[in-house]
Amino acid sequence: MPGNKGIVKRWRDAAPIFAKTGMADELDRLIQPQVTLKSGGYLIINQTEALVAIDVNSGKSTKEHSIEETALATNLEAAEEVARQLRLRDLAGLIVIDFIDMDENRNNRAVEKKLKECLKTDRARIQVGRISHFGLMEMSRQRMRASVLESTMSVCPTCNGTGYVRSPQAVALHLLRSLEEQLTRNSKFDL
């Protein structure tokens, strides 16, 4: 890109730039579903055909005095990380965030405010809903380009993208049923 001529500089170190700067590890983390938070909590990010589901878990995050305080602290930290991950992973479309349930309505509003604040620097068009009584927040984010997962991964030919393959027992039963079906179709063989 000619416009970047003054910005881009040639890498002269013997070590590869991605290894030296730690970018290779960062890129590997972008395709992992789990994102660990500093507090010990974590996010699980699942990108599906219909939507992106983000689950917030407290994990080892128990530094606060009560369950409500732990949930609030983890959710506030998660809101910040969710905004970051949306940009890094180029996640778009319908996004549902399952925050840790909190009893106090003001805490839900604080998490909503934090997420909206963190999303202000995002160039994509975003609509953010409110946290429901189930602890779910719906939002939509404009697709700027294909997500990191879509642009760097291909569908597994074994499971066709489900993430599951048949168990050995299920394979054996499937083979037996198929064999039985074939034998009943061909009357030469006696069962």
Where are the language model's segments positioned?
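Extended, charged alpha/beta regions that create polyanion-binding interfaces
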Residues: 1-48
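Conserved glycine-centered short motifs in functionally critical loops
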Residues: 37-191
